Amino acid sequence: DERLDPFRSTEAAAQLLAYNYRVLGTWPLALTAYNHGAAGMRRAAEQVGTTDFVTINRTYTSRTFGFASRNFYPSFLAALTIDQNPEKYFGAIERAPELKFHEIEMPAYARIDAIERALGVPRDSLRDLNPALRAPVWSGSRLVPRGYRLRLAATANGWTSEKLASALGPGELYAGQIRARSHK
């Protein structure tokens, strides 16, 4: 579930914001659309007759344009202000070191234990770097999917999809996912 992965969810959010901006033409509306939807913000701009966020925020009425939608952009600006000078608001902050990693695209479906063995990478490292992989993958009841961008520590940057496929071997590569058991 890539929603659990801060890197993938950030990429998806950036893509949505870029789309909203292309559709709406202003960053305040694009950011508000992240909460309210691009169609909803387009409707608001058309009804009010402007793309000016302040005017829309003060005059647009809709049963769905409530507190969260009205305050999404101002909340973003507040968070941005804090991010630009966090020490002013929180005092001294100890920052975690930058996470460095390398990604390879899974060439086929494969078991996590086979991947771990082929790469010679500890399971904890794989788990920490791949939060989108859920418990069934780690327990072995599901496979890491083909096309998944497997994140490895930067020290493993010599690995490619092709090298992984060779290291796994044909008996450890699968064309499809393990079928889920259904309970009656």
Which role does the model predict for each range below?
Residues 1-23, 28-184:
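Extracytoplasmic and endomembrane cell-envelope/extracellular-matrix remodeling and assembly machinery
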